[in-house]
Design a protein with these regions (language model features):
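C-terminal beta-strand-loop-alpha-helix "lid" module of Rossmann-like NAD(P)-dependent dehydrogenases
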Residues: 1-214
Length: 214
């Protein structure tokens, strides 16, 4: 039977662990609130930009043809897989990984290329012998516009050089703190949804090429 001293040490150890766990929970909650606030602040802007680009795709571009609007037979697909740098994130990275594997299916490296953001998707896909064209990591805690721009510039260059025929981003769509959904979204070429208003006229300053290629 444990002595009274052993019991006191055990109680103290459990109490200390509870305090540490509580502190970790408070830090995680604060970081989640900050991340959610940033996501909520940028979402209307991103949605509006997407809507404008889709409208532009059916407007009069004065004979200018942007590679962003060029639709062609899909022989090779670029997948951008976005996950975390570290673990302890529940199913955040594993759900994205599962969806990425489903999307790639039985494709050979001649039929796909992979760009990963985050160490977890990179390591997981590499361990499964998928060829990774380019990887980025070290910024999942504090992603910035510049980080996103570097990734997109690489994917765009592949698309413009006809090395890939479409670009699909696989990421986690944040709904609320309890619900996050792994999602695959085609971002190139730009597509016009059936419910969008077609044929709107836009004034381009200085010209369509400068606007669409910015």
């Amino acid at each position: 039977m444990a002595s009274a001293q052993d019991l006191r040490k055990r109680i103290k150890s459990v109490t200390n662990t509870q305090q540490i766990t509580k502190a970790m929970k408070m830090v995680a909650s604060a970081r989640l609130r900050r991340a959610q606030a940033k996501a909520d602040a940028t979402r209307p802007y991103a949605e509006k930009i997407g809507q404008i680009l889709r409208h532009i795709s059916t407007s009069d571009l004065r004979d200018y043809v942007s590679p962003l609007l060029e639709s062609r037979p899909v022989k090779r697909t670029c997948y951008i897989v976005i996950g975390a740098d570290k673990g302890l994130a529940g199913a955040y990275s594993s759900n994205v990984l599962k969806l990425a594997i489903e999307q790639i299916g039985q494709k050979t490296p001649d039929e796909y290329c992979l760009i990963t953001a985050g160490r977890k998707p990179k390591d997981s896909l590499k361990s499964r012998h998928y060829h990774i064209d380019q990887s980025y990591s070290g910024f999942s805690d504090k992603p910035s516009y510049e980080h996103a721009r570097h990734i997109m510039d690489h994917a765009l260059s592949l698309y413009e050089r006809h090395e890939v025929d479409e670009v699909i981003m696989i990421y986690t769509r944040f709904v609320n703190s309890m619900t996050q959904i792994a999602q695959a979204e085609c971002i190139l070429p730009l597509e016009q949804p059936d419910d969008e208003v077609k044929g709107e006229e836009y004034e381009f300053m200085p010209d369509p090429a400068s606007v669409l290629d910015a």
